[in-house]
Amino acid sequence: VEFLDVVRRRKTTNGPFRPDPVSPEHQRLLMEVAGRAPSQLNSQPWRFVLVDDRSMIERIATISGESMTEAMSNGTFFERYKPYFRFSAAEMQESRSGMLFDKLPAALRPFTKQVFTRRGQKLMNSFRVPQTLGEENRKLVAGSPLLIGVMLDRSEYRPGELSSFYSVFSMGAAMENIWLTTVEIGMGIQFVSFPMEVPGRWAEIESLLGVPDDLELMAVYRLGYLPADQQRPAIDWSSHERKLPSQYVFRNTCATPETEWDDR
């Protein structure tokens, strides 16, 4: 696959993976490309823990599913991220950013405009939407053959200092290398983020992974091979839209948007 095709095809996998274990060769490759990422002064602050033990994956999946249910039930998730929710193609076309919820059960579609109100939250809770989403999330994580915990060396990652920015920037480059490589080898990847949304749950995952005091757990991802027929969850979204170059590129100064590329 040509490199630019890989970049353009990169995406998050919301659906299930095949149950096949990720081969040792591919695990090794993913770690190699991560280690090839740039870092300030070649500090290489990243550390990774590969999780393929079924019982541990199941336990992390339970934490993730419960976290999603709680964050959805109490409204904190919708309140925190409502600027990024879209419920029509027109909304998505106008903003060219965020997530378009284009797959919803028929019973919920009439209530999308109320999702950010108290009444909307009560309706979702009465339809047990948080429980449905939480269980879907649990099953997705539990069905993943591989999880990757991404950590930073605390001697490099020092919040409030410039070194912290360098470390996070380097970690992002390492993860992008992994992400692009999954496209090349027929795999998918998704951020397991909900345990970070609920106080105390992230610490449970740190404990499960045995993260030592000199490392900071920054993220967990689920990975696996993509099935030929990719099934979408009962409630799903897409995020293919991208801003026009003139919305994020400037020429010489930030007062002059680059307008020549929008029609390409």
Task: Please identify what each model-predicted range represents.
Residues 1-264:
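Acidic, surface-exposed loops and disordered segments
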